[in-house]
Regions:
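Helix-turn-helix
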Residues: 16, 24-58, 62, 66
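A short, Lys/Arg-enriched amphipathic alpha-helix from helix-turn-helix/homeodomain DNA-binding modules
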Residues: 11-23, 74, 123
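Hydrophobic alpha-helical connector segments
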Residues: 62, 76-108, 163-167, 190, ...
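Hydrophobic/aromatic-rich alpha-helical bundle segments in the mid-to-C-terminal region
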Residues: 110-115, 128, 132, 150-196, ...
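Amphipathic alpha-helical packing segments from all-alpha helical-bundle domains
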Residues: 69-72, 76, 125-152, 161-165
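Hydrophobic/aromatic residues within well-ordered alpha-helical segments
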Residues: 13, 56, 63, 67, ...
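Short secondary-structure transition hinges
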Residues: 101-140
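N-terminal intrinsically disordered/low-complexity leader segments
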Residues: 1-12, 207-216
Length: 216
């Protein structure tokens, strides 16, 4: 996984620890993953570990933050005022959904998303608060897009903050469904989310997805 640059000479050392932890958590294992196993895989010392992280929980939260930032940066491009072609809010919303389903359906990223949602990660002290911050950061681009639509009348019924939560929650539900592992179901799931979003935002029927895409 491409790491968020640390800007420090020891950044490669930190990245090896993070990547090794992702590997250890993703592979089948019994019981919790011990720091010693992570260090052995990363080929670093305990001193190196504690130079970057105060504890294993701190490492886990850093991993969550790294995955969140990679996703958020990709989504921010769509909501940026200087986005190529200056697309209208509806085009931006559709592009945001496209990006979410493309990113989360990729084999590599799906692996990292699975790890940050695993039971051991969830047990880390501070995980719940960090996960909420992650949600807000990831959805900030969607909030911005909905606010654009409210301002120009594209989304007359939107309440940007609450609608972003609802739309993102449905995206997450679709992406964690067993159906998403069938490539043919990815566009179906994506269009299902779009239809829900456009109804909630008050978009006229002419802009809704063609009903033919509802076929299961």
């Amino acid at each position: 996984m491409q790491s968020v640059p640390s800007g420090q000479p020891s950044g490669d050392e930190r990245d090896r620890i993070v990547e090794s932890t992702f590997d250890c958590l993703f592979e089948p294992h019994q019981g919790p993953v011990h720091v010693s196993a992570i260090l052995a895989r990363a080929e670093v010392s305990s001193r190196a570990f504690y130079r970057h992280f105060e504890s294993k929980d701190d490492l886990f939260l850093a991993m969550l933050g790294q995955v969140t930032e990679l996703l958020a940066v990709a989504l921010d491009e769509i909501a940026a005022p200087d986005a190529p072609g200056d697309p209208d809010p509806l085009s931006r919303l559709r592009a945001w959904l496209d990006r979410m389903f493309t990113l989360a359906s990729s084999t590599e990223l799906h692996r990292y998303l699975a790890v940050v949602d695993c039971d051991e990660m969830r047990s880390a002290k501070g995980y719940r608060e960090a996960r909420e911050q992650s949600r807000v950061r990831r959805e900030s681009s969607l909030v911005a897009i909905l606010a654009m639509g409210l301002a120009d009348g594209s989304f007359p019924l939107t309440e940007p903050e609450s609608d972003a939560i609802a739309i993102a929650a449905l995206v997450s539900r679709e992406l964690t469904s067993a159906r998403i592992y069938d490539p043919a179901q990815v566009p179906v799931a994506r269009d299902r989310v779009e239809r829900f979003a456009l109804r909630a935002l008050g978009v006229v029927a002419a802009n809704t997805v063609n009903s033919d895409t509802t076929a299961q």
